Amino acid sequence: MSPDNPVPVTPAAKPTERYQSFTGAASVRYPAPDVARGFMLLLIALANAPFWLVLFRDRAEVTGADTIWTGLRAALVDHRSYPLFAMLFGFGLAIMARRRIEAAMRSAEADLPPGTDPAARERHLDRAREAAVVDARRLVRRRGLWMILFGAVHGIIFAGDIIGTYGVIATIFAGTIVERKRTRMLVVGIVMTLVCAWSMSYMGWAAGGGPEAAGLTASEATAFSPVVRTAPGPSLPFDNLIGWLFSTFFALTSAMTIPAAFLGVRLADSDLMSRPDRHRRALLVGGAAALVVGAAGSVLNTRLTGGAPIYTLIGGAPAPQSFLTGPALPVWLASLTPVIDILTGLVGACGWLALLAAWAGPG
């Protein structure tokens, strides 16, 4: 293996303290990942609630309490929960693959009789390592395919399902994750960040008056919308499934899920989650600062959308009016604000993870 693509396996390695966070028979189970996952599920539920607005043509009058909650949700939940999910998902896949490889290497080491020639031992372990990497890659890809299947079933009921999105990530990038292809993760992460920025910029442009300025009709403006609008009726399950396909693609290309998942893979190479007590001060200070950055990055986007999902505004639908909204933004600024929101959203997700790890970890 090249230095750029290390497989973190040591022959005959015993689980070290660094990797004992989860299931070792004689090891402490650190609660940080579990607490973060539980809190993340709460944030996902809150983030998905506005999705149901696509089922209603009319909206209830916005109250003061609604407005306050909308501002808090935009600052701390929207575009922050999905990257948090993705980081934990990438982290979990990396740990699962590492443990699979390490178990195979311990078994291969145990199969060697005493006094084995060093050269023969090295060849045996090299073959075992290659087979273990292939096995771990298949394991990750198999998990991904099952997630896509479960996501499709869930998508029949709820078109905004996110399970399939992470299944696609695991299936496509199984080798990258298992073998820690750092350069590939960096390049793909940068490319997908640019794709997400373009996608959100288009939606900001479409929601902020760009189609009218360009002379497009509402139907032309929504031609590239990533959301299929559904309405209750006999065809709803089929409509939801079609909507799920679009929303899965949308999440991959606009929600920073792939870059965040790769961050989670890199996180597995540290002890920030397994031993957060060693980094408590940095996690607390850095986490709080990251949440502030994430909250600040949401302000202009909330002014543009009024807290409504931006895809519901494409085609000329008005944003909910409250003290969070104001005079119409210039088209160029409306195009930029969702980009700022998703980029700072990833920062905010890192903030949540840091604070949760510091709170839940031993110490």
What do these predicted regions represent?
Residues 257, 321-363:
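Alpha-helical transmembrane segments of multi-pass integral membrane proteins
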Residues 58-163:
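Membrane helical hairpin/interfacial module
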Residues 93-101, 175-181, 265-275, 356-363:
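Structural signal for the C-terminal ends of transmembrane alpha-helices
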Residues 60-62, 303-335:
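Membrane-interface interhelical connector segments
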Residues 67-81, 238-251, 326-344:
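Short aromatic-rich membrane-water interface segments that cap or initiate transmembrane helices
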Residues 2-98:
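N-terminal signal-anchor module of multipass membrane proteins
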Residues 25-42, 179-193, 277-290:
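Alpha-helical transmembrane segments and their helix-start/interface "positive-inside/aromatic belt" motifs
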Residues 190-269:
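Long hydrophobic alpha-helical segments that form multi-pass transmembrane helix bundles
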